[in-house]
Amino acid sequence: MMLEHILVLSAYLFSIGIYGLITSRNMVRALMCLELILNAVNINFVTFSDFFDSRQLKGNIFSIFVIAIAAAEAAIGSAIVSSIYRNRKSTRINQSTLLNK
């Protein structure tokens, strides 16, 4: 595949993630959009690593670290969302004002 096609795909995924993160009112949907953004960045890391220096695996290794961090972020985020749901009976972002108490 050509470099431009992969970068367009990555930009498309990143744009969908940003749009969903900005317009989302549900915490679970916001977490999913954040994962889309991280995956778009991973695609860029792997693409540029392969395009500029295919003998070294720096971009691929960095992508593995980002995937591991994203998995931890998803686990912690879903635990926080489930805790908020237990207390508030809602996962809507605008109804979660935990700092006001």
UniProtKB/Swiss-Prot annotation:
One of its GO terms (biological process) is ATP synthesis coupled electron transport. The chain crosses the membrane at residues 2-22, 32-52, 61-81. It comes from the Eukaryota. GO terms for molecular function: oxidoreductase activity, acting on NAD(P)H, quinone or similar compound as acceptor; quinone binding. It is a multi-pass membrane protein. Its EC number is 7.1.1.-. Gene3D superfamilies: 1.10.287.3510. GO terms for cellular component: chloroplast thylakoid membrane; NADH dehydrogenase complex. It is an enzyme of class 7 (translocase). Keywords: Chloroplast, Membrane, NAD, NADP, Plastid, Plastoquinone, Quinone, Thylakoid, Translocase, Transmembrane, Transmembrane helix, Transport. The keyword Plastid applies. InterPro entries: NADH_UbQ_OxRdtase_chain4L/K, NUOK/Mnh_C1-like. It catalyses: a plastoquinone + NADH + (n+1) H(+)(in) = a plastoquinol + NAD(+) + n H(+)(out); a plastoquinone + NADPH + (n+1) H(+)(in) = a plastoquinol + NADP(+) + n H(+)(out). It is found in: Plastid, Chloroplast thylakoid membrane. Its main location: plastid. Belongs to the complex I subunit 4L family. NDH is composed of at least 16 different subunits, 5 of which are encoded in the nucleus. NDH shuttles electrons from NAD(P)H:plastoquinone, via FMN and iron-sulfur (Fe-S) centers, to quinones in the photosynthetic chain and possibly in a chloroplast respiratory chain. The immediate electron acceptor for the enzyme in this species is believed to be plastoquinone. Couples the redox reaction to proton translocation, and thus conserves the redox energy in a proton gradient. HAMAP family: NDH1_NuoK (MF_01456). This is NAD(P)H-quinone oxidoreductase subunit 4L, chloroplastic. It comes from Gossypium hirsutum. The gene is ndhE.
